Amino acid sequence: MNSQEQNARFVEWARSYDAVWWKIARLYAPAGEHEALHQDLLIALWHAAPLYRAQAKASTFIYRVALNSAMNWSRSRTRYGRRHVALDEKSAQAPSKDNESDERERQVEQLYAALATLSEADRSIALLYLDELSYREIADVLGITESYVGVRLNRVKKRLMERLGKENRQ
């Protein structure tokens, strides 16, 4: 494959999976660093794109690159003491007039907060499940068996329900 084809592939993937990049950035980076991680994920994809060999689905390859890059990024921030609590981007915005929209946004924020308390591996499984990947696809992305995906996913769901239940009671 020539460089022009590789560039076209990268641009297509970057556009098609933009929502995935943002979800992963939001899940693995503090609020003030979402943009930085998003850019790092795109750079990782740029470097990895020539390695794609169509033995797996493109989405499997893309998720694997993105999740591994995000976990490495998160570990490097923790290792070097750069992990901090940033101001929530939403707190500076004017309140919305739509109560239903506000409630939905609050629920999404609660879900992301609960997901952030999980281990990196559990966050990855939850994200892939929420993105409606099949157990087989999740197994391919993470390099584990389908049955283990089921076991881990059940544990993750229980933990999330416990954490979300505690938040709703407070």
Identify the function of each model-found stretch:
Residues 117-137:
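Short amphipathic alpha helix immediately N-terminal
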